[in-house]
Every structure is written in structure tokens, then in C-alpha cells.
Curated annotation (Swiss-Prot):
Record GO biological process: regulation of DNA-templated transcription
Low complexity bias: start-end ranges: 128-142
A GO CC term assigned to this protein in UniProt: nucleus
Domain of life, source organism: Eukaryota
Protein name (database record): Transcription factor bHLH77
Region (Disordered): 1-25, 65-206, 352-371
The species this protein was found in: Arabidopsis thaliana
CDD domains documented for this protein: bHLH_AtBPE_like
């Protein structure tokens, strides 16, 4: 028979009834029946054809409306499990047509597979796209699980290797520390702390210096009369300077007086004045008393000569020890100086009358008389 491939495959999938028209007692398909009928038409009798209820079998499997409608190509369905396993190649069709034993085996397997639709199809049949998609998804899930496990394992391996590396580094560092001697701890001082120390030391030194200055100023205040009432340092210093200048003027005045009183006596007045000025507790009257004692030891001829000598009122005496020239009339007009001299000589005369033994020092005098 000349049939299309689709029709032939469809007939191969359609099962026969419970009775085999060939009398073998095995179930088969319509395709097998038609193939045998075409090859050996004499084997099939009209009685067997009548007993073969084709319409009933078709009506059980497929609904009939307006004639027989064969199911479409099995590849168009979602899966091959609805119809069981089937041969897909022409070689399987030819072998099934030639070998009746293989046909009976195939019919038995198709029947069992049709009853057990959930079983996996066996043979050379193609897998359905749904099963392939399921297997692919399962493989992907398993791959993801495996990948995640592999990632976890790799992370664990990396962590373990890092720990091992850290332990190795620590062991190396410990060995190096053991090899090197421990350094002494260094005392680090902040810059601000150093500046604070410097300022503290500077302030202490400044305080000590100011204390010394204040002590010396108090000593000067005690020496200068009337200086204790002054509070300001500048004013106090001015007062001390004025007092020292006044003392200097007094010393100059006394030296000039001595030069005018005894102009012809050349004794070591400078040495006596220096020794008298060095002694701090000696007063002016004591110095004059020493000078008077030296005059008493002079011979009586000096006094007689002095009385007979004329008074040089208008003459100027040469300066002694570099003092300024002064005139005698102006000098003797000073009442204060005359009173001081009279008081000194009066004290000397009283002491001479009371004390016969004089304790005055007798300096060596070199008297020179002018003709």
C-alpha cells in the first residue's frame, strides 16, 4: 500500500482489539495488520475480518464525529508518555513488518507502557522537550548546589590558607623578635610639654632675679633717709641718685676747706682722706679731730711764724688734688663752714685739758717753711 509516513506512523500507534485476526492470540496494531494483509491477503479470511471490530476499538480510543479521525503526529503532543514508546525510524517499521516475533514483543511493551504512563520510555525513541527541560533544570539546580558548595569549599580553603599564612607570619615575626634584643622604652615628650617646661624654668629664673633686685632696693632705701616713703621704683632711684650727688658735693667742699686752712702743710692728706672715707662708721668730726691732733704735734715755731705772716686776702692759692680755684674771701663768708671748724677745734681743746695722755695718731709730717 502506498501511504504517507504520517499515516503509517499513526496506524502503527493504533492498537487492535483483544483478538488477533491472524489467530495468534496476541494483540497488535492496525499498521501491522494492514501490512500483513497487503503482503499476504490470503491469510486473512472474511470471517476474521467480521470478527475484528475495528469500529469498536477506534470508538473506545478516539471519539468519532463524521467519520474516523486519526490522532495527529505524536511529536505534536506535549510528551510521548500518553501513547507509550514508539519506533521513530523506517528500519524499525520494516523489521516489525518482517519479523512477527518482534511485533508481538513490541505490542506487549506498548501495552504495558500505555498502562504505566509515568514510566520512562525505553528504546531508541526521542525524549520529549518537557523531560529534557526538567532534566536540564534539575542539572542546573544540582550544578548550582554543587557550585555553591564548591564556592563554600573554595572560601573555606582560602580562609584556611590565609590563616595558615598569618600563623606562618606570626611564627616568623616571633622568631625575629627572639633574635633581636628588646629595645628600651623611649620617653617621648610632646612639643607643647617641652615648651611648658621651658616657660616654667624661665619664669622661675625671672622670679629669682626680681627678688634679688627687690632686696637690694630695700637696702638702698635703708641707707637713704626719707626713701622708705616712696613706693615707685623710678622715683626711688631718682632720690638715691640725688642723695649720692649731694654727698659728692660735700666731700669736694671739705677737701677745698682743708686746702685753704693749711696751705703750706704738705702731708699725705689724700691717704688720710681715703682711709677715713673707707671706714663706714667714722663721722666727719672724728676726721677733723685726727687732723687737729696732727697740728698739735707741730713745733711752737710754726705758730709764731704763722702769727707773723701776713694775710693773703687777695691772693689765690694753687689748687690741691685737682680741685677748682676758689677765692678766700668768698670761702670764709660761709658761716656753716666756720661753725663746723670752730666746733671741731673747741672739742680738741677740751679733750687736751681733760686728758694729758693723748691717744691721737702721730703721722709723719714734712714741714716746709718759705722765707
Amino acid at each position: 500500500m502506498n501511504m504517507d509516513k504520517e499515516t503509517e506512523q499513526t496506524l502503527n500507534y493504533l492498537p487492535l482489539g483483544q483478538s488477533d485476526p491472524f489467530g495468534n492470540g496476541n494483540e497488535g496494531t492496525i499498521g501491522d495488520f494492514l501490512g500483513r494483509y497487503c503482503n499476504n491477503p490470503q491469510e486473512i479470511s472474511p470471517l476474521t475480518l467480521q470478527s475484528f471490530s475495528l469500529n469498536s476499538q477506534i470508538s473506545e480510543n478516539f471519539p468519532i464525529s463524521g467519520g474516523i479521525r486519526f490522532p495527529p503526529y505524536p511529536g505534536q503532543f506535549g510528551s510521548d508518555r500518553e501513547f507509550g514508546s514508539q519506533p521513530t525510524t523506517q528500519e524499525s517499521n520494516k523489521s516489525s513488518l518482517l519479523d512477527p516475533d518482534s511485533v508481538s514483543d513490541r505490542v506487549h511493551t506498548t501495552k504495558s507502557n500505555s498502562r504505566k504512563r509515568k514510566s520512562i520510555p525505553s528504546g531508541n525513541g526521542k525524549e520529549s522537550p518537557a523531560s529534557s527541560s526538567l532534566t536540564a533544570s534539575n542539572s542546573k539546580v544540582s550544578g548550582e548546589n554543587g557550585g555553591s558548595k564548591g564556592g563554600k569549599r573554595s572560601k573555606q580553603d582560602v580562609a584556611g590558607s590565609s590563616k595558615n599564612g598569618v600563623e606562618k607570619c606570626d611564627s616568623k615575626g616571633d622568631n625575629k623578635d627572639d633574635a633581636k634584643p628588646p629595645e628600651a622604652p623611649k620617653d617621648y615628650i610632646h612639643v607643647r610639654a617641652r615648651r611648658g617646661q621651658a616657660t616654667d624654668s624661665h619664669s622661675l629664673a625671672e622670679r629669682a632675679r626680681r627678688e634679688k633686685i627687690s632686696e637690694r632696693m630695700t637696702l638702698l632705701q635703708d641707707l637713704v633717709p626719707g626713701c622708705n616713703r616712696i613706693t615707685g621704683k623710678a622715683v626711688m632711684l631718682d632720690e638715691i641718685i640725688n642723695y649720692v650727688q649731694s654727698l659728692q658735693r660735700q666731700v669736694e667742699f671739705l677737701s677745698m676747706k682743708l686746702a685753704t686752712v693749711n696751705p703750706r702743710m704738705e702731708f699725705n692728706a689724700n691717704a688720710s682722706l681715703s682711709t677715713e672715707m673707707i671706714q663706714p662708721g667714722e663721722s666727719l668730726t672724728q676726721s677733723l679731730y685726727a687732723m687737729a691732733c696732727s697740728e698739735q704735734r707741730l713745733p711752737s715755731a710754726y705758730y709764731s711764724l704763722g702769727k707773723n705772716m701776713p694775710r693773703f686776702s687777695d691772693t689765690q692759692f694753687p689748687s690741691n688734688d685737682g680741685f677748682v680755684h676758689t677765692e678766700t674771701p668768698g670761702f670764709w663768708e660761709n658761716n656753716d663752714l666756720q661753725s663746723i671748724v670752730q666746733m671741731g677745734f673747741g672739742d680738741i681743746l677740751q679733750q687736751q685739758s681733760n686728758n694729758n695722755n693723748n691717744n691721737c695718731s702721730e703721722p709723719t709730717l714734712q714741714m716746709k717753711l718759705e722765707p
